[in-house]
């Protein structure tokens, strides 16, 4: 449960996934997987073909989600996952955000 982890043990990662990751269901698979794991955050496509996402939750669960990003859904071909650690903001829910222009 996302609310069962003390705030001090929560982490936030900002990831950028490179490869064939648009048009293959990456965003919606990310929402499903992150929601099943009890993470909060968001995911969106970028104009340069990458997928950007933010995950907040317990360290071990967030790290599991980052590992999932290295493979993605079956049709994806992931070349790289860049990970930046940030301060948690206390996000609620998990959503697909609109494309950045």
UniProtKB/Swiss-Prot annotation:
Catalytic reaction list: an acyl phosphate + H2O = a carboxylate + phosphate + H(+)
UniProt domain Acylphosphatase-like: residue ranges: 12-98
Domain of life of the source: Bacteria
Active-site annotation: 27, 45
Keywords annotated in UniProt: Hydrolase
Transmembrane segments: none
MF (Gene Ontology): acylphosphatase activity
SUPFAM superfamilies, A to Z: Acylphosphatase/BLUF domain-like
Pfam families (UniProt xref): Acylphosphatase
EC number(s) stated in the UniProt entry for this protein: 3.6.1.7
InterPro entries attached to this UniProt entry: Acylphosphatase, Acylphosphatase-like_dom, Acylphosphatase-like_dom_sf, Acylphosphatase_CS
Entry-linked PANTHER family: ACYLPHOSPHATASE
Similarity annotation: Belongs to the acylphosphatase family.
Protein name per its UniProtKB record: Acylphosphatase
Organism: Trichormus variabilis (strain ATCC 29413 / PCC 7937) (Anabaena variabilis)
Gene: acyP
